[in-house]
Swiss-Prot record:
Keyword annotations from UniProtKB, A to Z: Acetylation, DNA replication, DNA-binding, Mitochondrion, Mitochondrion nucleoid, Phosphoprotein, Transit peptide
UniProt source species: Bos taurus
An annotated Gene Ontology molecular function: enzyme activator activity
GO BP term, example: protein homotetramerization
Record's signal peptide: none
Domain SSB as annotated: residue spans: 30-141
Name of the protein in its database record: Single-stranded DNA-binding protein, mitochondrial
PANTHER family xrefs: SINGLE-STRANDED DNA-BINDING PROTEIN, SINGLE-STRANDED DNA-BINDING PROTEIN, MITOCHONDRIAL
Cell compartments where the protein resides: Mitochondrion; Mitochondrion matrix, Mitochondrion nucleoid
Main location: mitochondrion
Pfam families the UniProt entry points to: SSB (PF00436)
Residue span of the annotated presequence: 1-16
């Protein structure tokens, strides 16, 4: 009774059908990143031979905390750690908007996924790179406002 609908569902989720489709365990996974920070450099449009162009820029996120001896940490020193993220935009419409409107110092929100890759540098050394592949960018403000 339920076998036919189950097989149909499995075929929708599994790209390569096999004879053991009925023994497959269907599980979901999630690769999702949300970043809120400031742009560290103006974006660069890059075209790698044989691949679609992409827009690349860096985004800084800050983690701040108070440390001190008292329990509430109200009077302690403020510490900050800045983490830099490499953002790549491949989607054609979003790629062009990011290239045109993302500017150094802009505060933006980025949604995307983490991608780990390897490349060979100009000295023929293999390097690993972590990149955030952006699916959505929300512009929150212009560049940092000058204080009077």
């Amino acid at each position: 009774m339920f076998r036919r609908p189950v097989v149909q569902v499995l075929r929708q989720f599994v790209r390569h059908e096999s004879e053991v489709a009925s023994s497959l365990v269907l599980e979901r996974s999630l690769n999702r990143v949300q970043l809120l920070g400031r742009v560290g450099q103006d974006p660069v449009m890059r075209q790698v031979e044989g691949k679609n162009p992409d827009t690349i820029f860096s985004l800084a996120t800050n983690e701040m905390w108070r440390s001190g001896e008292n329990e509430t940490y109200q009077m302690g020193d403020v510490s900050q750690k800045t983490t830099w993220h490499r953002i790549s935009v491949f989607r054609p419409g979003l790629r062009d908007v990011a290239y045109q409107y993302v500017k150094k110092g802009s505060r933006i929100y980025v949604e995307g996924k983490v991608d780990y890759g390897e490349y060979t540098d100009k000295n023929n050394v293999r390097r690993q790179a972590t990149t955030i592949i952006a699916d959505n960018i929300i512009f929150l403000s212009d560049q940092i406002k000058e204080k009077p």
